[in-house]
Amino acid sequence: MAHQAHPYHMVDPSPWPLTGATAALLMTSGLAIWFHFHSLLLLYLGLTLLLLTMIQWWRDIIREGTFQGHHTPPVQKGLRYGMILFIVSEVFFFLGFFWAFYHSSLAPTPELGGCWPPTGINPLDPFEVPLLNTAVLLASGVTVTWAHHGLMEGNRKEAIQALTLTIILGVYFTALQAMEYYEAPFTIADGVYGTTFFVATGFHGLHVIIGSTFLAVCLLRQVLYHFTSEHHFGFEAAAWYWHFVDVVWLFLYVSIYWWGS
């Protein structure tokens, strides 16, 4: 390898942006075909290609950062800024859903019966499954912080236990949310209430699944001795993302489940 006189990582040519873009094209085309022709083949093909791209790309980044030493302090600083900007973009993504909800609920139109929830909608009790989900996510926020402290103190066993517990709580939250959707007395087609409810909570649920996957990768890396008390940005990014998911849920719970009911 040629000597470089700077601390920055000059990335090698990679096929993964191309395969990722192809997967995105297949998924959007597949979604349209599923809606109009009831065929899932193209959508599944796109999802499979996306999954393979993610696995291969993450594998390359882990190799570069863990085994090849390319993630120097300036590179880590750039990755931190990148993750912060990504989370900020996600905040604005959810802001659109909250805007739609409050736009519809603060001044209900005559078509909705002039009230919120709209006439004919039987909302979910905020003090049953939604409250349990809130407790589960808050507990997972505590366990992921516990894992971070264990990692920083070099307590490998404690970090593994806390991370495992966090993933279990994430999976439990997803299972409770799926049960709630299955038993909900309204659907996504039931006017603006059903649409805002299922789109906002559904996208949050998708983020919980992504966050749980992110943490599962971190758990595997921790088991394989990839992290040290000084060098563990992959875990830090996962923890930031998980805390963001927690905070979004609190706003969803207070707005849609509690105030909106």
Curated annotation (Swiss-Prot):
Protein name: Cytochrome c oxidase subunit 3
Subcellular location: Mitochondrion inner membrane
Mitochondrial intermembrane side: 35-40, 106-128, 184-190, 257-261
Membrane disposition: Multi-pass membrane protein
GO terms assigned for molecular function: cytochrome-c oxidase activity
Family per similarity comment: Belongs to the cytochrome c oxidase subunit 3 family.
Gene3D superfamilies referenced in this protein's UniProt entry, alphabetically: 1.10.287.70, Cytochrome c oxidase, subunit III, four-helix bundle
Record-linked InterPro entries: Cyt_c/ubiquinol_Oxase_su3, Cyt_c_oxase_su3_dom, Cyt_c_oxidase-like_su3, Cyt_c_oxidase_su3-like_sf, Cyt_c_oxidase_su3_a-hlx
GO CC entries: mitochondrial inner membrane; respiratory chain complex IV
SUPFAM superfamilies: Cytochrome c oxidase subunit III-like
Catalytic activity: 4 Fe(II)-[cytochrome c] + O2 + 8 H(+)(in) = 4 Fe(III)-[cytochrome c] + 2 H2O + 4 H(+)(out)
Record field: transmembrane: 16-34, 41-66, 73-105, 129-152, 156-183, 191-223, 233-256
EC number: 7.1.1.9
Example of a GO biological process term: mitochondrial electron transport, cytochrome c to oxygen
Subunit composition and interactions: Component of the cytochrome c oxidase (complex IV, CIV), a multisubunit enzyme composed of 14 subunits. The complex is composed of a catalytic core of 3 subunits MT-CO1, MT-CO2 and MT-CO3, encoded in the mitochondrial DNA, and 11 supernumerary subunits COX4I, COX5A, COX5B, COX6A, COX6B, COX6C, COX7A, COX7B, COX7C, COX8 and NDUFA4, which are encoded in the nuclear genome.
Keywords on record: Membrane, Mitochondrion, Mitochondrion inner membrane, Translocase, Transmembrane, Transmembrane helix
